[in-house]
Design a protein with these regions (language model features):
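Accessory nucleic acid-recognition modules appended to NTPase machines
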Residues: 1-84
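Active-site ExK catalytic segment of metal-dependent nucleases
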Residues: 79-94, 102
């Protein structure tokens, strides 16, 4: 029997639309397991939030990849049917540099698929057509509302 304790998420070249062969990322299936192993979730809040978003996307039936645009990482490329959505995850967009990092990589992707930044900020500050949502709102949204694939 196989125990699925972690999910392997392959990397994907956003520009070339090709899978990359190395450096997959791994996400735990149960956040409680990570805590039980002694990891400090408060110190690793960015990783915890990424993990939550990854598992939520999988539970919604999405195929999930980690994207690369040049030397910059796109946290998730989520696909379901013909629909694609790019997602960046950040703890807080507390300063200009963080906002630029999270929105900037999405702004550099030259297609019209929906792009979203998910954070714990209580107020949404989308820009240039990129949606910004609080993680609670992301988790509560209708999983089929914006997927037309």
């Amino acid at each position: 029997a196989e125990a699925y304790l972690v999910d392997k998420v392959p990397r994907f070249d956003v520009v070339g639309k090709q899978p990359l062969r190395a450096d997959e990322k791994y996400y735990v299936v149960d956040q409680g397991l990570r805590t039980a192993l002694g990891f400090d979730n408060r110190a690793d809040i960015e990783l915890v939030l990424e993990n939550i978003v990854c598992q939520e996307l999988r539970s919604r039936g999405c195929t999930v990849h980690v994207g690369w645009r040049g030397s910059r990482e796109v946290d998730f490329i989520a696909q379901r049917g013909a629909a694609t959505r790019y997602i960046q995850v950040s703890y807080l967009l507390a300063d200009k540099a963080t906002a630029e990092r999270e929105f900037g990589v999405l702004e550099s992707i030259p297609d019209n698929h929906p792009k979203t930044v998910v954070s714990m900020d209580p107020v949404s500050r989308g820009r240039n057509g990129i949606e910004h949502v609080n993680i609670v709102d992301f988790l509560l949204e209708d999983p089929l509302a914006e997927w037309n694939g």
